[in-house]
Amino acid sequence: MGHGCSQNTNERRNTLGQFGLAHINDSGRRFASYLAINNLLALTTCYQKNSYGTWIHPRSKLHHQLDHILTDKSTSQFFTDAGVTQSLIDSDHRAVQCKVRLQSRLKKRSTTRQRLLQLDYSGLGCERKKDAFCQDVLERYNAQPENRSKYTRLATAVECVTRASLPRKTKPQPGWFSAAQNEITPLIQQRNDAMSKTFEKCTRSTTNKLRTARKSLKNAVSKAKSNWISSTCNTLNESSSAHGGTKMYWDTVGKLRNGLKKSQSCSERPMKKPDGTLCKTPEENAEVFKNHFQKLYGRQPVFDPSVLEHLHRHAIVSNCDHTPDDEEIIKATSRLKERGPGDSGICPQVWKAVIRHEQTFAILKAIIVDFWESEIAPAEWEVGLLKILAKKGDLSDPGNYRGIMLLETAYKIIAIILHDRLRPIQEGLDMEPQCGFCSGRGCTDCVFTVKIALKKRREHGLETWVLFLDLVKAFDRVPREMLWTILEKFGVPAKLVRLLKSLHANVQVKFTVNEVTNTIQCVIGVKQGDILGPLLFLFFLAAVMITWKKVHERPLCLYYTKYDDVLSGRRYNTKGEEFSLPDSEYADDTAVLFVSRESLVESTPLLIAHFARFGMEIHVGLPDKLSKSEILFVAAPDHTYEDSSTYDGADLTNVELGDGRYLPVVDIFKYLGSILSRDCRDDADVHARIDAASHAFGALRECLFTSTEVSYSAKKVVYEGLILSILLYGSEIWCLTEMLFNKLRVFHARCVRAMCRVTRLHTRMHRITTTELLQRLNLNTIDQYITRRQLRWLGHVARMERERLPRKLLTSWVRNKRPRGAPQFTYGRGVMKALKKAEIKKDSWYDIAQDRVVWRTLIYR
């Protein structure tokens, strides 16, 4: 086989190196295809040598490269050289050899935290064991020297008793097997015994017993897999697509794949140094992450405190700074989630057991009261164990990773108490556009607000410019001194502010990379992974947006509304309640609406400078870096322009900010998982949903959907809870034409045929209709699923309070005359079609929707 780098494609370079003989022939192409399918690399083509030929043709005397050394790509880093050498035997082939760098790895000694995580805490549910455990903790606590702090003594006692009294939990088997291990293990033993007897003496009796044992085992395995899949997806099936987003569904895909089929763990990636070269040792990798997080958490904040002079000082909220009582502490401890503990490794189950014993609870209460009165946090509460998680993008760049802090479980008790005290204050602020980290609100609220606002203006012949802001490391850049001032301005009692200062005074971040542990000081930002983090961030964002609206005035998008059941819009001169829509916010994902490019160009630099006064940085474009903040131009209908190709000479160039910085003007933008386009059509969003659902279905096709071991009922649960949730995310707001409906129907039918293991040829030959296949799986048509989701959301918005933006926009209109031409297919007309399909009268839907139970009964009948 010949090989030449001149004819290599980019895909082929992933399997073949750049060195070889002559040109690649048909055999070489088949060889490259084999390498790609099996994820292999030909080492002998990766190193430059004087000779590559391993065989000489007997007639032409031409050299051919036939012999190779193949390796898995994940282990290619251990090879240092590969090439051709002279064979020591009488053969027409030459030998190939390689050099391997091997390094023995000593078994890593587990830490105290890891040993505590390996224990089985289920025994603490027994009252007798719980009392004995607490009694042992009390004895250990009293036996320690009194010069140590109360929390240190209690934590040490809990750790010692936990390690001494609790057993190690058995290592779980992957996924479905662990749930049915007790039932399947005896059947495996029976099968093995029958097989041994058959090998010893093969008779009709032993063969029948072996056949029966195998059949019983196969049926049990099939049932166990179906039960495990149903239990895994039941919770997801009951949840709404507005909560959790696409990430929750992809996590479920990974869980199902790992539970049904063993997956391989990836190795540590080499990181890029500042000079662009890759790290070669674990120590260099750890040093890169240390420098990255030192720069992120150790930078001194830069802000302008004078900007807070525009923030109105609220009256101090009373009756929220008193010392926590027994009921409040017990309630906060009971709400602890059984997630990753902090550096000590003490799990929430232990503290839930501690509060059930009178004397140990008294010690825990004394620790909390001492902190509340002295305002000095225990040293253990100031250490956060940082878990480094990868984001999208180049994973050799440390900037594409984020850290989540695992905090002490006892600290979370006081954090929950403070959170419950601060939440009513935050909810009393004027933050109607904000939907992030707020109860009863989600992504769909923001997407609905922006989409309906843009479609209303386009329907009335108006252009809109939308600035989508992306903040750089928003959580990790909050200036704490400014945050404390903001809390005081919003009426938070001084006692609670001092307690928060104490909890953030000396935060230590500890993380391990490639078995190298580093600890750095964190002097900026709120803690990611802390229940207080999102709440404090909302206070901070409220101050930013409130001061922005007070300092800078600009033309706003005005709408008019009446709180009734008219959805199709009114005449442009109809009277109604006026309201404006300046922006829509989901945490730090902000969409700011402008009526013209001139207003946008004038306000954008001021907005960026305003965020900079609060220590925030907006992600803008540079000559060598793309921008994550973008501008979407939403045009009026095409027939309103003389030249629709240029929108009558509209300026669609990038918005220049000076010093080479810019913001691009784009045709489409992905906002909170939903795609917004220039013409306000939903084609791009539907296509993106079909692509995402196709990837999810393909990931589970082999191990689940086409498996004969999985029942139809289990397939239905997974398909409805996972695939349809991904496919129909955001469908509550879609304005679907018949062409888009057909595309969704085609995808739905293709998935149904795959789950029934029926091809299109079978359906034609045997005249099997899609309706019959849907009945086998007990599934509905895609039209029914979309109609139910749209009407469910319509009823939810109709029941909202009148101050909510989605409720106002539902029946709103723009005071501008509609342009001449065919009427557009609006959201109101789409919902009216859904009401007709559900056989709900158009003049009575609003009154029916006020009763949630009756409304859901009608749309699900």
Predicted segments with their positions:
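Active-site-proximal segment of RNA-dependent polymerases
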Residues: W176, Q300-E328, I376, W381-L385, ...
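Inter-domain linker/hinge segments that demarcate the starts of reverse transcriptase
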Residues: N192, H322-S334, A362-F371, R421-L422, ...
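Conserved, non-catalytic sequence blocks in retroelement Pol enzymes and Pol-derived host proteins
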Residues: G20-G28, I56-K61, L88-D90, P145-K150, ...
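A shared catalytic/ligand-binding motif for oxyanion handling
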Residues: M1-L217, C233, G795
